[in-house]
Amino acid sequence: MMKYIFIALCFTAIVLASESDVAKASEKGLTVRGGDMLLDCIVAVLAQIVSGLLRVIIGLVITLSGVLEIVIGVVVLLVDVLAALALDLVKGSVTGICSDFLDFDYVTEYIEESLRSSSAQLLAGLVQALLALPLAVLVALVALTESIARSSCSIGLSECGLL
C-alpha cells in the first residue's frame, strides 16, 4: 500500500515540476509545452510495466517446465507399470521352467522399488509445479511495482532538479 502512495507522490512531483518549468519559461517569454514531460514520464512508466509483464511470462514458462516434468514422470511411471505387468506375465509362464536359473523374487522386488521411486519423483514434480506458479506470480508482481516506483520517482526527482 505504501508503494502506491509513494508512486502517487512521485507523479505529483512530476506534474508540479512541469508546471513550475512552464511558469519559469513564461516569465522569460518562452513557450514550453509541459505535457511533453508528462508524456515522457508516462512512456517510461509504460516501458517499466512491459518489462514487469515480461517477467510474468518468464515465471509462467518456468511453471510450464514443472508441468512438463510431471508429464514426463507420468510417462515413465506408465512404462514402469507396463514393464512390471509384462514381467508378471513372463514370470507366470516361465516359472516352472526357469525357477532354478532365475530368482524372480529379486526381480519383482526391484520392479516394486523402481515404481516407488518413480511415484516419489512424480509427487516431487507435482509439488514443484504447484509451488512455482504462485511464487512466480508474486515475484513478478513485486518486480512490477518496484520498477514502476523506481522509474516514476527517478523521473520525478530529475524533473524537480534533485537528481
Curated annotation (Swiss-Prot):
It comes from Physarum polycephalum (Slime mold). Might be involved in spherule cell wall formation. The keyword DNA damage does not apply. To HAP-P protein. Pfam families: HAP. This is Sporulation-specific hydrophobic abundant protein. The keyword Membrane applies. GO terms for cellular component: membrane. It is found in: Membrane. One of its GO terms (biological process) is sporulation resulting in formation of a cellular spore. Residues 1-20 form the signal peptide. Keywords: Cell wall biogenesis/degradation, Membrane, Signal, Sporulation.
